[in-house]
Regions:
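Lumenal/extracellular ectodomains and adaptor appendage modules
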Residues: 1-374
C-alpha cells in the first residue's frame, strides 16, 4: 500500500465450493444464510528481501446478490453483510482480523478504477466536502386540473454548475434547451417535491411551471408552493439512507454516494436521481481488508474465504454464471503457480479459462502464471 510490495506469490490454490445453487428468492434470513456456496483463495507468499514486510491486502468478492435477503421486514433486522460473518481470513492456519469494505460498483470491475475508490477516510473531491452546506427546498403541488393524469412540474437551470449542484428526488426527466436545462417531475395536487441545492445557494429559487404532460410542451394552470426549508451539511445529506447498524462504514458509504453523484451529473450541475434518498446499498462491491507480516526471507500461507453468488439466467432451465476477479492479482511483483479446483456435482458448460479437466468431484485447472481476464 502506497509503495511497491516485494512479496512474491509462489502459489495460489483457488477453490470453489458449489455444492448447491442459490434460490432466486429467500423468505427468511435463516434460509439465505444457510446457502453454502463459497470461494477460498489460499496463497503461499514469499518475502525475498532482508527486511520484514507488512502489507495491507484487499480482496474483492462481488456485490450482495439481488436475490439475497438483506432486510427482514417482520423483525426490522438489518441483514446486509451478515453472510460474511461465517467466513474469515487466516495466516498459517490462525484466524486474523479482517475489515469489510465497500465501494461503488454499478459498472463492471476495472482494476485501477475500482482500487482508486478505496480511501482511508473521506475521499478528496474537487467539489464536494463533508461540511459543505446543503439546503432542501420542499415544494407542494396545487391548483392542477385533476383530469390531467400525467401533469409535470418543471423549472430551468442556467450557469455552469461550478458553485452549486442540484439534486431532485423523483425527477422524471431533463432536457437541454439552448443555454438552459429543463428539469421536470410528475406531479398532481398535494404531491411534494424535494430540491437539494448543494454548495453556494442561488440568489433566486426555482421558477416553477406546470405542463400537461411529460413532454413539457403545453403549459397549464397550477403551482408549486414552497412549504419547507431545511439546512444540513453535505455529510448529513449523503447519509439520508445510511443504516448505522449495517456492516458498511460511514466513510465507505459517503465515498460511494460521491462517486454516484459525479457519475450521474449532467449539464449545469444537475444530478440525475436513480436511487431513492441516495440509497446505494444495492450497488456496492464488497472487499476484505486485512494485514499480513512476513519476516526476512520468510514464507506464510494466507487463506481467504468469502461467499460466492452466481448470476441466475432463465427460470424453467436456469444457468448460473460465477465470476471471480483474477485481475487484482496483477498487482503482485511476481505471480507463479495457480491451481483452480471446482467442487460441484453440476456440469460446467463453459469457462473464460481454457484447460479445465473433469475430476470425480468437479473440475480442476493448473497454470504456471496468472491468466489474463477474470
Amino acid at each position: 500500500k502506497d509503495e511497491e510490495c516485494p512479496v512474491i506469490v509462489e502459489r495460489e490454490l483457488l477453490t470453489f465450493d458449489v455444492s448447491e445453487f442459490p434460490r432466486s428468492h429467500y423468505e427468511s434470513r435463516e434460509a439465505f444464510l444457510s446457502y453454502s456456496g463459497n470461494v477460498s483463495a489460499e496463497y503461499t507468499f514469499y518475502n525475498p528481501e532482508d527486511y520484514t514486510v507488512t502489507a495491507t491486502l484487499l480482496f474483492p468478492f462481488g456485490k450482495a446478490p439481488d436475490y439475497g435477503f438483506q432486510y427482514d421486514t417482520v423483525t426490522m433486522e438489518e441483514c446486509f453483510g451478515a453472510d460474511t460473518e461465517k467466513y474469515g481470513v487466516t495466516v498459517n492456519g490462525e484466524e486474523i482480523e479482517k475489515t469489510l469494505r465497500h465501494t461503488y460498483a454499478a459498472d463492471d470491475f476495472e482494476l485501477e478504477r475500482d482500487l482508486a475508490k478505496l480511501h482511508d477516510g473521506y475521499a478528496d473531491d474537487p467539489f464536494y466536502d463533508p461540511d459543505m452546506p446543503v439546503t432542501r427546498y420542499t415544494y407542494t403541488a396545487g391548483g392542477i386540473d385533476p383530469e390531467l393524469d400525467a401533469a409535470s412540474a418543471g423549472f430551468r437551470l442556467s450557469g455552469g454548475g461550478g458553485k452549486t449542484k442540484v439534486y431532485m428526488e423523483d425527477s422524471s426527466g431533463y432536457n437541454r434547451l439552448g443555454k438552459e436545462l429543463e428539469i421536470s417531475a410528475w406531479v398532481n395536487n398535494g404531491v411534494q417535491v424535494d430540491v437539494y441545492m448543494i454548495g453556494e445557494q442561488p440568489e433566486e429559487l426555482p421558477d416553477w411551471y406546470i405542463c400537461e404532460d411529460g413532454s413539457m410542451e403545453e403549459r397549464t394552470e397550477g403551482e408549486m408552493t414552497l412549504t419547507d426549508v431545511e439546512e444540513m451539511t453535505f455529510r448529513e445529506f449523503t447519509m439520508m439512507s445510511y443504516d448505522t447498524d449495517s456492516h458498511i462504514s460511514e466513510t465507505d458509504w459517503y465515498n460511494a454516494v460521491i462517486y454516484e453523484m459525479n457519475l450521474y451529473e449532467k449539464s449545469f450541475g444537475f444530478i440525475e436521481s436513480f436511487f431513492d434518498k441516495l440509497d446505494v446499498s444495492d450497488t456496492l462491491m464488497r472487499w476484505y481488508e486485512y494485514e499480513i507480516t512476513i519476516g526476512p526471507g520468510g514464507r506464510i500461507t494466507n487463506e481467504v474465504t468469502a461467499p460466492v453468488y452466481p448470476e441466475i439466467h432463465g427460470e424453467s432451465n436456469p444457468t448460473y454464471d460465477y465470476t471471480y476477479l483474477l485481475s487484482p492479482a496483477q498487482t503482485w511483483k511476481e505471480f507463479h503457480d495457480l491451481e483452480v479446483v471446482i467442487r460441484t456435482p453440476y456440469i460446467m458448460r463453459e469457462s473464460s479459462l481454457e484447460g479445465f479437466e473433469e475430476t470425480e468431484d468437479g473440475y480442476t485447472l493448473a497454470a504456471d502464471s496468472l491468466p489474463p481476464g477474470e
